[in-house]
């Protein structure tokens, strides 16, 4: 059973400072709305929302923070064959200091009865650090720590006793790990079968998916009041909009005839 609890980005696209999206339910829940709109599930004594809305003005960074999921899958699941291959790196562009610092993503997630924190720091040249911790009630247990020393150009990974990686597995991963590959992508490359590490790899490869909706035509897809089916769908959409405090009570689809200025039409003809 896989659930995401939080996602944090630092120096990533438009996010200069550490910014977190929480997927947890607050105490002041509305039970009726919860029942209507999926609500939450309790995992490891934490109430995790099944559905989250991101609201904000154009340019507020909604799509950029969601692109962190895409970045995670790219860094973790894709294999670089050469250590000089560049990585996708999008730091905060309006501060010169940020251009010389790594980006960072942290994700807290649940796999069955366990809760984990994974963090990764990188720039276009290398992955500088990876940490995987198991989060328990009173303490955090480190499972592995990987780091890259830029001065010596050496990559190291330390698997703790808690993760029970054999000496042979440790040797294969350590000797195969390039500065621009993650521990998990190296596991893919070396085809290592380790139950716990493979379960995390499966989470990052299949636990979430970015769906591109840019080609959806709202004029065609948005339901109106013409049929009973579309009325019901419209009521659901309006209920969603109301539940997230948009102050939108209803909407209408109107056909608008566009009139182009004569001067513009004349210029287009002369091109």
Predicted stretch roles:
Residues 21, 105-107, 130, 144:
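Well-ordered beta-strand positions enriched in small/hydrophobic/aromatic, beta-favoring residues
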Residues 3-71:
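Pre-Walker A-like glycine/lysine-rich segment at the N-terminus of P-loop NTPase domains
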Residues 37-39, 43-53, 57, 66-127:
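Conserved P-loop NTP-binding catalytic core
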Residues 117-269:
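Electropositive, glycine-dotted interaction segments
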Residues 17, 63, 74, 128-129, ...:
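Short catalytic/ligand-binding loop motif for oxyanion handling, primarily in non-cytosolic enzymes
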Residues 9, 107-111, 134:
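Short acidic, glycine-rich loop/turn motifs
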Residues 4-7, 103-105, 113-115, 234-236:
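Short alpha-helical segments and helix-capping/turn motifs at coil-helix boundaries
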Residues 1, 268-271:
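Short, intrinsically disordered, charge-balanced linker/junction segments flanking boundaries
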């Amino acid at each position: 059973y896989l659930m995401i609890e939080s996602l944090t980005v630092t120096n990533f696209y438009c996010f200069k400072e550490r910014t977190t999206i929480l997927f947890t339910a607050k105490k002041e829940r509305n039970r009726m709305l919860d029942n209507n709109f999926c609500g939450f599930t309790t995992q490891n004594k934490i109430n995790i929302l099944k559905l989250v809305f991101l609201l904000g003005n154009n340019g507020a960074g909604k799509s950029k923070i969601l692109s962190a999921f895409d970045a995670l899958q790219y860094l973790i699941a894709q294999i670089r064959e050469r250590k000089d291959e560049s990585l996708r790196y999008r730091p905060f562009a309006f501060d010169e200091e940020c251009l010389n610092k790594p980006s960072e993503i942290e994700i807290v997630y649940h796999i069955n009865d366990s809760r984990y924190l994974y963090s990764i720091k990188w720039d276009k040249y290398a992955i500088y650090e990876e940490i995987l911790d198991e989060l328990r009630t009173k303490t955090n247990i480190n499972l592995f720590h990987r780091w890259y020393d830029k001065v010596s150009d050496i990559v190291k990974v330390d698997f703790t006793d808690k993760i029970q990686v054999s000496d042979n597995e440790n040797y294969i991963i350590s000797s195969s790990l390039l500065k621009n590959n993650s521990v998990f992508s190296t596991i893919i490359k070396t085809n290592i079968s380790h139950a716990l590490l493979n379960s995390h790899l499966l989470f990052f490869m299949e636990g979430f998916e970015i769906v591109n909706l840019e080609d959806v035509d709202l004029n065609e897809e948005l339901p109106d009041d013409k049929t009973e089916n579309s009325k019901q769908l419209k009521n659901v959409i309006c209920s969603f909009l109301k539940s997230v405090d948009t102050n939108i009570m209803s909407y209408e689809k109107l056909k608008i005839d566009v009139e182009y200025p004569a001067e513009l039409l004349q210029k287009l003809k002369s091109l």
